[in-house]
Amino acid sequence: MIRSCKFILCGFLMGLTLNASAQQSAPAASAPPSAVGTLAGHPDWPAAKNPGDVDTVDHLLATLYDVVSGPAGQRDWDRFRALFLPDGRIVSLVPESAATKDRPARKGDAIFLTPDMFAQQNDSYFKTNGFFERSIANRVEEFGNLIEVWSTSEIRDAKDDVQPSSRGIDSFQIVHAHGRFWIASLLFDHERPGVTLPAKYLKNAGL
């Protein structure tokens, strides 16, 4: 399907070219294709200040958890942004819920943000609330420059809390490009009544 669409597009463009050539002389050479949509097309995107943050998948994920974790206070959002591809996505899955006396029924939904939007929407929360997240197990798949990690994580309000306030899965889609690793997207969902973590997600698997 992709191939046939490509041929249709080429035929369409060829028709335009033949049409134009019948009316005027050949145009001057066009400018090089735009770099928008590539890493080179985002020169202002924060670079990783510490190459050790992004040189391995383990370091990439450890850095993400390190950046968002800590007592109430400012987070290093440039360090956070630098872990992601420009215009990468962070998606929170919102479960469906029945109506209660305090709120109406809610449909299941997905809230998707860019790294910039995530920082803007959560900055005030982190400034006034402690938040500590750590990975307890990873399931890793890899092919070529594509890596997928299901990271089982725990969240605590204070570092020394015995029990986590929540647990869930962070699903990372990661790519290797320009000599380093990047998060292309991050989706997450949490345990709740009726949805608990299976035992297989509480131990490491894969690479």
Model-derived features: positions:
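N-terminal secretory signal peptides that target proteins for export/translocation
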Residues: 1-5
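Bacterial N-terminal signal peptides
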Residues: 6-19
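Short, low-complexity N-terminal intrinsically disordered segments enriched in polar/charged residues
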Residues: 23-83, 203-206
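Surface-exposed, charged secondary-structure patches
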Residues: 24-26, 102-161
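Short beta-strand edge/turn micro-motifs at domain boundaries
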Residues: 31-38, 148-150, 167-198
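Hydrophobic pocket/interface hotspot
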Residues: 64, 80, 88, 149, ...
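Short, well-ordered alpha-helical segments enriched in acidic and aromatic residues
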Residues: 73-100
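A mature extracytoplasmic/lumenal domain signature
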Residues: 94-96, 151-155, 187
